[in-house]
Swiss-Prot record:
Changing N236I: In PRLTS6; decreased protein abundance; reduced assembly of the mitochondrial ribosomal small subunit. It comes from the Eukaryota. This is GTPase Era, mitochondrial. The lineage of its organism: Eukaryota, Metazoa, Chordata, Craniata, Vertebrata. Residues 146-150 are annotated as: G2.
Length: 437
């Protein structure tokens, strides 16, 4: 029997040492395993001509996918496969993605399908929820408004069921679109997506005191025009409410006290909490209110109500299972290996834009133009991306680069990590800043 190699002996010794300290401490000690296994560093972010690399905060076994033998040996907990079973990656090659999108669906005989539209105010958390339902981040997420600029499509395929998610921009008024010179897609896409919807998910951020007390007039008009489409209410970030009585008031207001054709039963001793600005749970007959009635602040035709907490994945699992059960017999629209209809370049541009929104102040990120100069596979199979960031002011250049290049380095590092998780390959990303003349 051949003697074990030096690398194999070191690996066994390291694994045993990690196993002895326990999985919680072990997570911070597993990073060096990549060198023991002979793996290359998974992400190198090169910014404005200066090399930048940061350690990947995950075990080396992640490079071979979830649920590896190394994780099981170390006692690491595995993700719930019932929430995100076999989540496909997105190809970094546009031609491969295009071929996959037109490939004949590999559906079973008893296939079922459901098209779901997510509607809500800007920054309500629609893209975050979409990513959670898909099991992989493919849509940009930011604390700033209008991160989603146009309709984006994601696909959930489990067993015989396929759910198609349409993540839309936050609904805005025509006046706001003109006043802020926003793209027309922000105004039109939520309405267009309703034309092919089987179910509408209305998302409300209950932590936002300015928007949580009522559905916007634009959203109510959209629901009224397509009233034949079933809808459900999802109240997001309920863990942010310190007093749960506020949650009851909001539920009564947003549903006009009616869910699935039945009036909500509230205790007579229930009183409004100061500062919520919600009406009494006692409401009029919803059928007697006209569409243009200024007193209408809710929608009395929701079939179900779901409450999501950022602290619990079980809430997302419950919503996902509901969507799967609502699917009707019909042919799939996509192959089971499809996760999103976006091109790799679109995903990359959106992710970088997300980081711009997160790291740049006020109006600056909205005035940055992105131009991809290089998109190719490197000699080691890594994805090489070079993108130019074009700005109209010298002051924007300084803000984007930051002291000693810190800001643009951070943007590239975070974008590279996200893209790695999307494409499941090494990513070499280079960003440069140029002043528009």
């Amino acid at each position: 029997m051949a003697a074990p190699s030096w690398r194999g002996a070191r690996l066994v010794q390291s694994v045993l040492r990690v196993w002895q300290v326990g999985p919680h401490v072990a997570r911070e000690r597993v990073i060096p395993f990549s060198s023991l296994l002979g793996f290359q560093r998974r992400c190198v972010s090169c910014v404005a001509g200066s090399a930048f690399s940061g350690p990947r905060l995950a075990s080396a076994s992640r490079s071979n996918g979830q649920g590896s033998a190394l994780d099981h040996f170390l006692g690491f907990s595995q993700p719930d496969s019932s929430v995100t079973p076999c989540v496909p990656a997105v190809s970094m090659n546009r031609d491969e993605q295009d071929v996959l999108l037109v490939h004949h669906p590999d559906m079973p005989e008893n296939s079922r399908v459901l098209r779901v539209v997510l509607l809500g105010a800007p920054n309500a958390g629609k893209s975050t929820l979409s990513n959670q339902l898909l099991g992989r981040k493919v849509f940009p997420v930011s604390r700033k408004v209008h991160t989603t600029r146009c309709q984006a499509l994601g696909v959930i395929t489990e067993k015989e069921t396929q759910v198609i998610l349409l993540d839309t921009p936050g609904i805005i008024s025509p006046g706001k679109q003109k006043r802020h010179h926003l793209e027309l897609s922000l105004l039109e896409d939520p309405w267009k997506s309703m034309e092919s919807a089987d179910l509408v998910v209305v998302l409300v951020d209950v932590s936002d005191k300015w928007t949580r007390n009522q559905l916007s007039p634009q959203l109510l008009r959209c629901l009224t025009k397509y009233s034949q489409i079933p809808s459900v209410l999802v109240m997001n970030k309920v863990d942010c409410l310190k007093q749960k009585s506020v949650l009851l008031e909001l539920t009564a207001a947003l549903t006009e006290g009616v869910v699935n054709g039945k009036k909500l039963k509230m205790r007579q001793a229930f009183h409004s909490h100061p500062g919520t600005h919600c009406p009494s749970p006692a409401v009029k007959d919803p059928n007697t209110q006209s569409v243009g009635n200024p007193q209408r602040i809710g929608w009395p035709h929701f079939k179900e109500i779901f409450m999501l907490s950022a602290l619990s994945q079980e809430d997302v699992k419950t919503l996902k299972q509901y969507l799967l059960t609502q699917a009707q017999p019909g042919p799939w629209e996509y192959h089971s290996a499809v996760l999103t209809s976006q091109t790799p370049e679109e995903i990359c541009a959106n992710i970088i834009r997300e980081k711009l929104l997160e790291h740049l102040p006020q109006e600056v990120p909205y005035n940055v133009q992105q131009k991809t100069a290089v998109w190719e596979e490197g000699p080691g199979g890594e994805l090489v991306i070079q993108q130019k960031l074009l700005v109209p002011k010298e002051s924007y250049v300084k803000l984007l680069i930051g002291p000693k290049g810190h800001v643009i380095s951070q943007i590239a590092q975070e974008a590279g990590h996200d893209l790695m998780d999307i494409f499941l390959c090494d990513v070499d990303i280079r960003l440069s800043v140029k002043l528009l003349k």
